[in-house]
Every structure is written in C-alpha cells, then in structure tokens.
A protein has these predicted regions:
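Active-site core of glycosidic bond-cleaving carbohydrate-active enzymes
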Residues: 1-39, 56-187
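Short amphipathic coiled-coil heptad-repeat segments
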Residues: 44-49, 53
Length: 187
C-alpha cells in the first residue's frame, strides 16, 4: 500500500544526515553537504508524505494507495519521532493532534494503523511506548486534556491488567499475546 516507501525510513535518513553533519563539524571536516541533504529530506517528507486532505502524514508518499486511502503511519517508532525530530510544521502538528484527538484515539489508547479494521499484531493494537511522541506534542501544544487522557489510559491499562504490557487491544484494553513486560512502564 505504501508503494515500497516508508515514512519512518525517510525520517531516519534525514536524521542520519543531520548526525553526519554534527559529527563532521565536531571533527573539523567539511559538513555542509550533509546539512543540505537533511534539509532536502525534510522538505521532501513534508511535501510528499503530508496529505492535506486528511491532515496527516501517510505511510506512503503522494501517488501510493496509502496516500489515496489516507492511511496514517503510526506503525511504530514514527509515532515517537515525528514531533521530536521536527518533521511536522506547527500547523501540521496541530492538525495531527486534532485528528488524533477527534478521529483516531480509542478509550484504551492510540491504535496503530488507524483505518485498518483487521486485527493483527500491528493493526488495531495499542503499543504504549509509541504514545510518548504524541504525549510530548500534546504537552508542547498546551493540549492538557489530551495529555492527561494519554497518561490516564496507560495507568488504567496497567491497573486493569495488573501490570504493564507492551501491547493492548485498541477495542477493549486487554493485554495482547505477550506476557507482562514491566519495561513498558517507561513509555
């Protein structure tokens, strides 16, 4: 559905170029080319993966099924990094968070791959650690009610299931498949 592309991979390449720039600069080497490449990647991500009709970044760029069907890429780490690494402009960030709050979030958390109705280890599951990027964005934007909701969901899921789990069912909050993993409390 993403036409062989992945938003998260593009984001990682952008950040790798930023890191290369910083490392080479520290070493006194020529580094500007990598800063230029990072800026080009950011511009491409914002132009090709941003779906203005949907108000989200999609898992595939313009021209793919994912873009046409408005498939939101929240299939993992990109849910954490899009805000932290400055992928979204302020306007995009506000639209993403509004869509999250009014169209995507369930009473038990943020389901991965919204729009996919099938239940797999990804679709319709809540991976708590990936909530952190959205929680940071909610805090930065002053969306206190959403921030409290995101935190309270994780607390309730832990209390309901009597410990922390990595994955929850987006429809009923029950722990999904794997045994308890207390390290997920860090999410």
């Amino acid at each position: 559905e993403a036409g062989g592309y992945a938003l998260s991979t593009e984001i990682y390449f952008m950040y790798a170029f930023e890191c290369a720039f910083n490392i080479l600069k520290c070493l006194g080497e020529l580094a500007e080319h990598y800063k230029f490449l990072a800026a080009q990647m950011l511009e491409m991500i914002r132009n090709k993966y941003w779906n203005p009709t949907a108000g989200i970044f999609t898992s595939g760029p313009e021209g793919t099924t994912a873009f046409k069907d408005e498939v939101w890429e929240t299939a993992g780490e990109e849910g954490v990094i899009w805000n932290i690494w400055g992928i979204a402009s302020e306007e995009q960030k506000n639209l993403i968070m509004d869509n999250l709050e009014h169209k995507i979030i369930t009473p038990y958390g943020i389901p991965l791959m919204p729009g996919h109705l099938e239940k797999t280890h990804l679709a319709r599951s809540v991976w708590t650690v990936y909530t952190t990027g959205y929680a940071v964005a909610a805090g930065e934007l002053g969306k206190e009610e959403l921030l409290v909701t995101l935190i309270a969901q994780q607390i309730r899921n832990a209390v309901f299931n009597k410990t922390f789990y990595e994955v929850y069912n987006a429809d009923d909050g029950r722990a999904w498949r794997w045994p308890a993993q207390t390290w997920n409390a860090i999410g």
